[in-house]
From Swiss-Prot:
Localization: Cytoplasm
A Pfam family recorded for this sequence: Cpn60_TCP1
Residues the entry annotates as binding ATP: T30, L31, G32, P33, K51, D87, G88, T89, T90, T91, G415, D496
Family classification: Belongs to the chaperonin (HSP60) family.
Subunit structure: Forms a cylinder of 14 subunits composed of two heptameric rings stacked back-to-back. Interacts with the co-chaperonin GroES.
Catalytic activity: ATP + H2O + a folded polypeptide = ADP + phosphate + an unfolded polypeptide
Name of the top EC class for this enzyme: isomerase
Protein name per the record: Chaperonin GroEL
EC number: 5.6.1.7
Family annotation (InterPro entries): Chaperonin_Cpn60_CS, Cpn60/GroEL, Cpn60/GroEL/TCP-1, GroEL-like_apical_dom_sf, GROEL-like_equatorial_sf, TCP-1-like_intermed_sf
Gene Ontology cellular component annotations, sorted alphabetically: cytoplasm
Domain of life: Bacteria
Primary role: Together with its co-chaperonin GroES, plays an essential role in assisting protein folding. The GroEL-GroES system forms a nano-cage that allows encapsulation of the non-native substrate proteins and provides a physical environment optimized to promote and accelerate protein folding.
Amino acid sequence: MTAKDIIFDSDARAKLKVGVDKLANAVKVTLGPAGRNVLIDKKFGAPTSTKDGVTVAKEIELADAVENMGAQMVREVASKTSDVAGDGTTTATVLAQAIYREGLKNVAAGARPIDLKRGIDRAVKEVVAELRNISRSISGKKEIAQVGTISANNDPEIGELIAEAMDKVGKDGVITVEEAKGMDTELKVVEGMQFDRGYLSPYFVTNPETMEAEIEDPLILIHDKKIGNMKELLPILEKSAQSGRPLLIIAEDIEGEALATLVVNKLRGTLKVCAVKAPGFGDRRKAMLEDIAILTGGTVISEEKGYKLENATLAYLGQAGRVNIDKDNTTIVEGKGTQEDIKARINEIKGQIDKSTSDYDTEKLQERLAKLSGGVAVLNIGASTEVEMKEKKARVEDALHATRAAVQEGIVVGGGVALIRAIKGLANAVADNEDQKTGIEIIRRALEEPLRQIVANTGTTDGAVVLEKVKAAEGDFGFNARTEQYENLVEAGVVDPTKVTRSALENAASVASILLTTEAAITDIKEEKSDMPAMPPGGMGGMGGMY
């Protein structure tokens, strides 16, 4: 086992503080509309330019082990806030640094760390309650655009695109961000349900120019097993041919005799038909087939449920207004399922999302939810260079997360003003002793720090003067760092999602409290590398002839 180095008390706390400050100082220059960019060296490829706090934090690794522990604890604040709310990582870092700095002063003066922590926890609880109290819900396209614009570092183009995407696919819709081939940033919306399976044979194509199969008003057969035998498929084929409507077959696979017969009949014109593989794998495939059945008003023909393909009737088949199929994707538009069934399925999936513990499962469930409830929007991000594109794509992803957070929990006034207004919630925080009261005061002081930093980053205005002016006012009045004017910030479009501000404070207080109650730090002792040259290979020379 490697030998360990242990440092205690003020020595440990001082070194941890150095690490906290190094990381926080690098991150906080990015805060606010006047925040600067940070350039990050990459071993492979071009350097990355970013104004995203968590991206900066994740790149920082310090040489001193104890300092690095302090830095990594604050990095955790940024990462957790990013995971939960998608934005507010720089605010969280600034708050964590301020809480730890103020707390250390009091620990050095003899305050009990555990009581400071209790005071901090009680203060945060009351501030969060006050934030929820002053929060307002958003619904309009304009408000959504404002949140997106602020989170994308005051880029109104991105804000408008996100608002338009949400307008098209709904608040639960899936919005994906991809790199565009050209320089233009644009929004593309896929209506209806799309899944990533194309036609099984190019002979099913109806439009040779686009190489797509376009089927109007089809019947849809949904089967969860492979179809290889024509005998079991024949009865339902005859029934659908008699109805005069085209048929789309979705099954685990269609092969051999069955596929060959479908192709021949399609080419002869006796049957309007197209076949595709079912999307997904395993249990997820079953769930997605059930989604398609509910959307189209059909039934999954599954032996598990007691249905056999040879006994299927037209009543089992789903229906849709239109289906478009290319070599990679199938899109079902205007499914004929009942709204009650679709709504019940949506609520069922929402329940599964709430219970899900896996990020991957949650993402897949949200995709299914979106496909049932509206469609999928794709934001194609264009830029003139790869460096700019990556930076812009990261900003769009941040803005998208923040906008979703705003829809969930509402918005508060931005520019650091919401935390100033939430200070009045501290009047409800109860302290059992002087040290707990000090913990509450630490939060009071820390809540001012984001506003101070936003002003400091403008480089032209005194933070103390702005702070006093904002504290003396009420409501949405604050300092707009972009225009350097005092005004109603909500009317000016300077807003933050409540979830972002709340998560930033809760995560910052949590990690800063752990650091404050730390009394010892244990690290590996670095082994001194020997300066002796290595022994030449081949053993002892000059001993030839000895036996």
